[in-house]
């Protein structure tokens, strides 16, 4: 359970790739990022591959259109890093990952998150040679991106409640029996974020290390526990999946996940005020209007949540156990707008 990706912390790390990466190589990144980094690469580069969509059929087309490459560099947020994993998996080439913000744990996970008919699926297998965390590069990202990464750790708060509830109500999956050891390991990563909330808010070197080390643990935890998601993901992620399904638009991953943590902790009656206070200390944006959503969007996602859980084949959580009625929707709206 302790195998984690090699992670290198430093400065000026992107400029070094041309000195050692296998040639020819491709950089998977985003259109808005590429102009900033284009001069860091040399004529051994045959890209870039600019990510347009995570719909699997489109990712497949993009990968098929690539020329021969001997390495891939993921440079960006979750979509760029997941696309790089997909390329490494399909082409069987070495992978190097460079997250440009602390927005998600994608750099530290083996599978790529793609969409199939609007439903999230985790596919493939790719382990990077290393993940490169450049302090100055991370700090140059918008603060809302860097703070949002706590969502992938704060979700342990609701996930652990869901797992215990499933055990106690006889709804626990046979393949994922409750394991206090896994919960305790996750708690270490969770507590690190809570204890360093102010440093993460400030994106100090200390804060970058604290959040990235927790994301490093969490990203690998799915595989390291035998493909068990129970200690790292629960109903809070299902809220995000339902929002994505309904709206058909991308999000900064940790923002809707954090909203899901608050909503589902309220449904669980699981210290919602306390976990909200932690989110506020970090400064993560979780209100719908900060994500370009309306409360009508959130309400619609909550209403279809049990149905979406069933459609997507997700596990038993508070979203299946407790009804979400109009009174709950109105009450949580008032609470989060206060």
Regions found by a protein language model. Name each.
Residues 153, 162, 166, 170-172, ...:
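C-terminal charged capping/lid subdomain of soluble metabolic enzymes
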Residues 19-20, 64-67, 121-126, 130, ...:
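Solvent-exposed alpha-helices and their adjacent loops that cap or buttress functional pockets
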Residues 91-189:
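A glycine/threonine-rich phosphate-anchoring loop and its flanking beta-alpha core
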Residues 66-87, 91-102:
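A short, small-residue-rich loop immediately preceding and capping a beta-strand
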């Amino acid at each position: 359970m302790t195998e984690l990706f090699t992670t290198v912390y430093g400065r000026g790390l992107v400029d070094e790739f041309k000195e050692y990466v296998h040639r020819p190589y491709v950089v998977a990144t985003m259109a808005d990022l590429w102009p900033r980094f284009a001069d860091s690469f040399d004529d051994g580069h045959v890209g870039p591959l600019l990510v347009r969509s995570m719909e699997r059929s489109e990712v497949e087309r993009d990968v098929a259109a690539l020329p021969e490459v001997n390495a891939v560099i993921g440079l960006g947020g979750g979509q760029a890093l997941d696309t790089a994993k997909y390329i490494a998996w399909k082409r069987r080439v070495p992978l190097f990952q460079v997250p440009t913000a602390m927005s998600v744990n994608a750099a530290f996970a083996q599978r790529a998150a793609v969409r199939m008919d609007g439903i999230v699926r985790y596919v493939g297998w790719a382990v990077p040679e290393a993940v490169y965390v450049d302090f100055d590069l991370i700090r140059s990202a918008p603060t809302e991106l860097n703070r949002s990464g706590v969502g992938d750790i704060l979700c342990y708060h609701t996930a652990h409640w869901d797992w215990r509830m499933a055990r106690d109500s006889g709804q626990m999956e046979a393949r994922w029996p409750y394991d206090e050891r896994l919960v305790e390991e996750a708690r270490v990563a969770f507590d690190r974020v809570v204890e360093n909330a102010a440093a993460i808010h400030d994106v100090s070197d200390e804060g970058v290390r604290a959040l990235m080390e927790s994301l490093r643990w969490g990203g690998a935890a799915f595989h390291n526990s035998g493909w068990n998601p129970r200690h790292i993901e629960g109903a809070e992620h299902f809220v995000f999946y339902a929002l994505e399904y309904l709206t058909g638009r991308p999000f900064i991953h940790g923002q809707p996940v954090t909203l899901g943590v608050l909503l589902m902790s309220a449904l669980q009656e699981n210290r919602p005020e306390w976990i909200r206070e932690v989110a506020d200390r970090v400064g993560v944006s979780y209100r719908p209007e900060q994500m370009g959503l309306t409360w009508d969007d959130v309400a619609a996602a909550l209403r279809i949540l049990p149905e979406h859980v069933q459609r997507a084949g997700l596990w038993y959580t508070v979203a299946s156990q407790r009804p979400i009625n109009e009174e709950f929707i109105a009450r949580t709206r008032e609470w989060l707008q206060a």
